[in-house]
């Protein structure tokens, strides 16, 4: 597998990141807390996916070649694009587990 050099977000994933930030701000009313959490989320994605692109489990129920990584209750759906040497985040959403 070629080395993955960057992470890109689909429009849907970028929108969902914004909604997650909005939700955290609504709950905390703290811009600092929101920025810190979003920074940790993005740092986690970068640290894990750039070093270990296959860290997520295969999640074909979401589409062909999709993998799923979970961070603090948020599912991160992505695919590995070997030709472009990148990770493509397709969606991020909250797992509402019982």
Question: PLM ranges: what are they?
Answer:
Residues 28, 67-98:
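Enriched for short, Lys/Arg-rich terminal
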Residues 1-63:
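Basic, Lys/Arg-enriched alpha-helical interface segments
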């Amino acid at each position: 597998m070629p080395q993955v050099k960057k992470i890109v977000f689909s429009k849907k994933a970028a929108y969902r990141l914004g909604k997650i930030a909005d939700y955290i701000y609504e709950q905390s009313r703290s811009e600092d807390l929101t920025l810190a959490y979003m920074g940790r989320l993005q740092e986690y994605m970068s640290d894990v996916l750039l070093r270990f692109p296959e860290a997520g489990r295969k999640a074909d129920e979401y589409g062909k070649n999709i993998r799923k990584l979970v961070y603090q209750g948020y599912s991160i759906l992505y695919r590995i694009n070997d030709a472009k040497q990148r990770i493509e985040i397709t969606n991020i959403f909250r797992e509402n587990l019982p």
